[in-house]
Amino acid sequence: MVDHVHFERELTLLKSDVSKMLFLVSESLNDAIESLETMNETLARKVLESDDMIDELNREIEEKAYQIIARYNPILKQLRYIITILKFSNDLERIGDLSCNIAEKCLFLSEEKIKFEMLKELKDMFGSTLKVVQDAFKAFVEEDVDLAFRLWKFDDVIDEMEKKIRRIVVERIREGNISAELALVYILIARDLERVGDHANNLCEEVIYIETGKNMKEFLRGVESGSEGADS
């Protein structure tokens, strides 16, 4: 039988660890983007160094989650909640890895002495992707299902941004206005940001599940029928 008082206390602590990890990942992504915008090698290296802390926190969350499962033998609904927390943590860890990828582009450009010209479209994608991750953090902390749902719907916008950047880069290559090395960097950065968007989208689905107990298919049916409170 589950000791509900201690069980809920440990779940609260677990969620607090995830909140801390979400803050670190959001900060890392912000630093990675800023390092590239300003070609700040020191900031780029800070992102790479902070990844170890994010990875360690992810491992701690996994270990605590498995200990909770072993100690309390939770019922199916509680087990699904814990597994969702684990998925949330793993998505954060992947965003941390992608932030490192972006920071590494700064170091590569600097080492190869390639002049980086910031595309307006890439800057826009930087801003949109960072805002989605930061707002996912807000939705998680404030248990805001409506915000999570609005962010979830925004994923298509980020996908279109990535496609637009790819088209612009291809056109510049055809016109001879960009080197092959810089073109590849643009495309890889846009791809990394699109993947960050995918993981942020997962975070939103996980917030919705944690707060409503419904997967996205069930939640969307509720939105369509008017039984869910999220804005359409």
Curated annotation (Swiss-Prot):
SUPFAM superfamilies: PhoU-like. Keywords: Cytoplasm, Phosphate transport, Transport. The gene is phoU1. Homodimer. Plays a role in the regulation of phosphate uptake. One of its GO terms (molecular function) is protein homodimerization activity. This is Phosphate-specific transport system accessory protein PhoU homolog 1. Gene3D superfamilies: Phosphate transport system protein phou homolog 2, domain 2. InterPro entries: P_transport_PhoU, PhoU-like_sf, PhoU_dom. It is found in: Cytoplasm. Belongs to the PhoU family. GO terms for biological process: intracellular phosphate ion homeostasis; negative regulation of phosphate metabolic process; negative regulation of phosphate transmembrane transport; phosphate ion transport. Its main location: cytoplasm. The lineage of its organism: Bacteria, Thermotogati, Thermotogota, Thermotogae, Thermotogales. GO terms for cellular component: cytoplasm.
